[in-house]
């Protein structure tokens, strides 16, 4: 999904590509890694990002918390790097560390991604769907998608809550 925000300092001039917000409820680490790689490819092909910077989101930043959900994101990050060694991906990162440069410097010093992410990968569908709808409704962002990935051509799935402006 493309999120066009009113905040140009985030993402790529206010544009973020996010996943998964519509398909896989509880992805395992391998599925999450594939989502990361596909979402970065979508960032290039659909959003025109020359340099996708992928943040694997969590409630923890680089070991600040210990939990099996965090372990899944760490494993998925490792697998994503194996699937695409050229991919710029880091995780686990909290959303503020991924998006806000000053926070990223504090929580993940030396990170190329922290504070500069333009692609966000959510740990599960529940988090992704809630996050995108909050950003869309409360942050007045335009949401384009969800875009189904991993098939021959991109497909857009419309939310029942979308407006005519969301379609066109």
Regions found by a protein language model. Give the residues of each.
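Anion-binding alpha/beta catalytic cores of soluble intermediary-metabolism enzymes, centered on
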Residues: 1-168
